[in-house]
């Protein structure tokens, strides 16, 4: 499995506050993606050349969820690997698909979350 990115993602109903906090810490907003899965907006923030954090606005979340965002070259391979290790997709087998990506949130048996994603290359 080839991993292409690895960084934290904060899924929250209060993205504006969290994005503002990271911007005050010196992170710069690189891009914003809207309409993910219908109503989620994701912000990619970068600090220098070394550090990234993603913040996703999800109004249906009762509280913040911090996960590890893992981008891979082969989504199906990584999804199957993680589910074979006991990770569960809380949405059943639902995969979020946009014109540029595929993603799913997977929860480990001990409760930590991985936001698995694949960036569709053109």
Show where each model-derived region lies:
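Core segments of cupin and vicinal oxygen chelate
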Residues: 2, 9-50
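Vicinal oxygen chelate
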Residues: 4-14, 32, 43, 60-122
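Extended, well-structured beta-strand/loop surface patches
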Residues: 6, 53-55
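Structural preference for long, well-ordered alpha-helical segments within the folded cores
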Residues: 20-24, 81, 110
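A short beta-turn/loop motif at secondary-structure boundaries
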Residues: 35-37, 59-62, 96-99
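Short, charged/polar, Gly/Pro-enriched secondary-structure boundary elements
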Residues: 49-53, 111-114
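A short, sequence-level motif marking secondary-structure junctions
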Residues: 57-62, 120-122
């Amino acid at each position: 499995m080839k991993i292409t990115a690895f960084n934290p993602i904060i899924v929250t109903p209060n993205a504006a506050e969290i994005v503002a906090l990271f911007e005050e810490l010196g992170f710069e907003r690189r891009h914003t993606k809207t309409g993910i899965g219908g109503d989620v907006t994701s912000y990619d923030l970068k600090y220098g050349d070394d550090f990234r954090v993603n913040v996703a606005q999800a109004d249906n979340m009762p509280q913040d969820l911090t996960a590890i965002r893992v981008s891979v070259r082969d989504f199906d391979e990584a999804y199957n690997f993680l589910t074979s290790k006991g990770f569960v997709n809380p949405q059943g087998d639902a995969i979020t698909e946009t014109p540029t990506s595929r993603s799913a949130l997977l929860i480990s048996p001990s409760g930590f979350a991985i936001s698995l994603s694949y960036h569709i290359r053109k």
